[in-house]
Design a protein with these regions (language model features):
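Anaerobic metallocofactor- and corrinoid-dependent redox/one-carbon enzyme cores
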Residues: 1-24, 28-38, 45, 49-52, ...
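N-terminal alpha-helical interaction blocks
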Residues: 133-147, 157, 161
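Boundary segments of small protein-protein interaction reader/adaptor domains
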Residues: 41-44, 103-134
Length: 502
């Protein structure tokens, strides 16, 4: 579809339906989004229908469609078994004679544009689009399908992916802040209130807004889970009195946490895991998320979720708990930039750490908890994405009224972190690389790859990456990253802090 769309674009034909479908279909293939085979059979079949319709339309308009690439005439099977058989041929790994370094860069590009697609879909839902985002996603997919580029050509596309992802995160930032206001520092309870309850997980703030609106006056309290935590900082969401707190931690702990939750559960976007029998009847999906046998809400009418919440017992009594602060996105942080600059100049703040990225179950992720705990008291820790759940409830104190732990937001709020870094570099009249700022990133899935590519596009160096380096990066490609960007694997918190701070 992207090969045809790219050829059609050369003749001035741009199809909005194709563009939106492309990012939604790509987003569906992200880790922990859609596990429903029937939906993928439909998606793949629809993709072929859209491709053939666009091909015919483009030809009639005088476009030259290159039909040599097999993907332009490929007809998918209509069953799961048939498609699995075809997948062995379609896979990037199918060509065993291919250059391993080029295959590595193709994988990086593919994972990167999947991350871009996720953010583009969220932005589009909130009314924010840029045609160059769709055009690049199609350019990248077409290149993977048919281009015979050299190593430098693929490196160029990978860095362009970082550029496009920056623009996409900017669109999503505009969508979120236009619809819900700029986040403000907000205290979020981690306990629970007596009463009926719904837990909402994932990333989609529009779904949350709809749920809050539909549950007004029904005696149901709404709790966030996972990356929904930063939603409490948005003025147009926090205004609802029944939006009462946060429950649980990161995505990989959901089986235990969901089983103990006494209400209904709504999964938006990723990150769903196989539901346990204990709560399978209480969990719902919406948007692009899917699991076979789980009720899917396709139209933002959350009546079934509300009905289930009213049937379930809810919390029998109030539960005391800690509280955490959220809402330190670019607007809030830059609003106190003068205090931050003064504290740096007065040596009250020695260094900033951006400790961010995905969480996961793999051993070694306790590095991030230990790193934050051991960071000296004259340092500030900015965090975003679900990696924060390794330490989000730590009380690190403050420096002159500035909290030492600043939650910038969801993974896409890397845009906010970049804007904060750029503003500080301008204030100190230096490059971002010359700031007293170190980036300690954890990676797990495709959005983290897209964010890393954005950092590389911006020329940011000395990024520490863990808990291990991605398996799809070959030694030669890693060498390019090390030589050009000084990327390095994490070691131990003590060793890395010593190297950074001296």
């Amino acid at each position: 579809l992207s090969v045809v769309a790219l050829d059609a674009r050369k003749a001035g034909i741009v199809d909005q339906e194709v563009d939106v479908f492309t990012v939604k279909a790509l987003f569906s293939t992200l880790t922990n989004v859609d596990f429903d085979p029937a939906r993928f059979v439909d998606l793949i079949g629809r993709c072929a229908v859209l491709r053939d319709a666009l091909k015919n339309r483009a030809k009639k308009a005088g476009a030259i469609i290159n039909e040599k690439p097999a993907v332009v005439t490929f007809q998918p099977e209509t069953t799961v078994t048939g498609l699995v058989g075809q997948a062995k041929v379609a896979s990037l790994k199918a060509d065993t004679q291919a250059n391993a370094d080029i295959q590595s860069l193709q994988h990086i590009l593919l994972f990167g544009i999947k991350g871009v697609a996720a953010y583009a879909d969220h932005a589009q839902i909130l009314g924010q689009e840029d045609d160059k985002v769709y055009a690049f996603v199609q350019e990248a997919l077409a290149a993977i399908s048919r281009e015979n580029l050299d190593l430098n050509g693929w490196v160029g596309l990978v860095l362009k992916c970082g550029e496009i992802n920056l623009r996409t995160m900017e669109l999503l930032d505009a969508g979120n802040t236009t619809a819900f206001g700029h986040p403000v520092p907000t205290k979020v309870p981690l306990g629970a209130k007596k009463g009926k309850a719904i837990l909402i997980s994932g990333h989609d703030l529009k779904d949350l807004a709809q749920l809050l609106k539909q549950t007004q006056g029904k005696g149901i309290n709404i709790y966030t889970h996972g990356e929904m935590l930063p939603a409490h900082g948005y003025p147009e969401l926090k205004k609802y009195p029944h939006f009462c707190g946060h429950y649980g931690t990161a995505w990989q702990n959901q089986a235990r946490e969901f089983a103990e939750f006494p209400g209904a559960i709504l999964m938006t976007t990723n990150c769903i895991q196989k539901p346990r029998d204990a709560y399978k009847d209480n969990i719902f999906t919406c948007g692009l998320v899917g699991w076979p046998g789980v009720t899917h809400i396709a139209d933002h009418d959350f009546a079934p979720v509300i009905k289930k919440a009213l049937e379930l017992p809810g919390f029998a009594e109030d539960r005391e708990g800690k509280s955490v602060m959220v809402g330190f996105a670019r607007n809030a942080v830059l609003g106190v930039a003068d205090k931050v600059i003064e504290a740096v100049k007065g040596k009250a703040i020695r260094h900033f750490f951006l400790v961010a990225g995905c969480d996961g179950a793999k051993p070694g992720r306790n590095y991030y908890t230990e790193f934050v705990e051991k960071a000296p008291k004259d340092t500030i820790v900015l965090t975003l994405a679900c990696g924060k759940f390794r330490f989000f409830d730590q009380d690190l104190g403050d420096i002159g009224g500035i909290p030492r732990l600043l939650d910038v937001g969801q993974c896409n709020d890397a845009y906010s972190a970049v804007q904060i870094a750029v503003a500080l570099s301008q204030a100190f009249n230096c490059s971002v690389n010359d700031l007293p700022l170190s980036m300690i990133l954890s990676w797990y899935e495709q959005k983290a790859v897209a964010i890393l590519l954005t950092m590389l596009y911006l020329g940011i160096k000395d990024i520490r990456l863990g808990p291990s380096l991605p398996a799809f990066i070959t030694p030669n490609v890693l060498n390019v990253l090390v030589e050009n960007f000084a990327i390095k694997p994490i070691t131990t918190p003590d060793e890395d802090l010593k190297t950074i701070l001296g």
